UniProtKB/Swiss-Prot annotation:
Amino acids binding Mg(2+): E85
Name of the molecule in the record: Isopentenyl-diphosphate Delta-isomerase
Primary localisation category: cytoplasm
Gene Ontology molecular function: isopentenyl-diphosphate delta-isomerase activity; metal ion binding
Record key words, sorted: Cytoplasm, Isomerase, Isoprene biosynthesis, Magnesium, Manganese, Metal-binding
A cellular component term, taken from the record's GO annotations: cytoplasm
Enzyme Commission designation: 5.3.3.2
Cofactor entry: Mg(2+); Mn(2+)
GO biological process: dimethylallyl diphosphate biosynthetic process; isopentenyl diphosphate biosynthetic process
Domain of life: Bacteria
Location of this chain's protein in the cell: Cytoplasm
Keyword set includes Metal-binding: yes
CDD domains for the chain: NUDIX_IPP_Isomerase
Amino acid sequence: MEERLILVDTDDRPIGICEKMRAHHEGLLHRAFSIFVFDSAGRLLLQQRALNKYHSGGLWSNTCCGHPRPREALPDAVRRRLGEEMGFACELRPVDALVYRARFENDLIEHEFVHIHVGRFDGTVAPDFAEVAAWRWIDVPTLLEWMADEPSAFTVWFHCMIERAGLPVLHRWAHR
């Protein structure tokens, strides 16, 4: 059975449920989340999306992203997906939300109401390599330089979130 997404209005109020690929073909606004995990040295955990992802394969992005399932509380979904995708758990806290829309080369459209969460973790990362091609810890100045030099190496939503919240702000939230 195909994954189903929670459709929302621009205030994040649920208005329906839809199959994932239909939502992405039609550009329907749906609930999502993005996670930024920092270590105690202040480095951000990045992931490179698996090459076979339905869009943005091979691009670098924040620690983890996902969608809550129908009737799944957002905090539960955030914890679940971090464990599934990156193989660890840590305390995560919500810090911001934004709406973005982007069309991809394969004509899929991401239109998400994204809840941004931050956390701190210093343990072992054990990603699911069906989801993640590679991962690395990176300090904020090096990441910002890399993003300026190679913007096309990163996902659209990662750029949106960095422009909205800024890595230093996310880092401060993670270390409170």
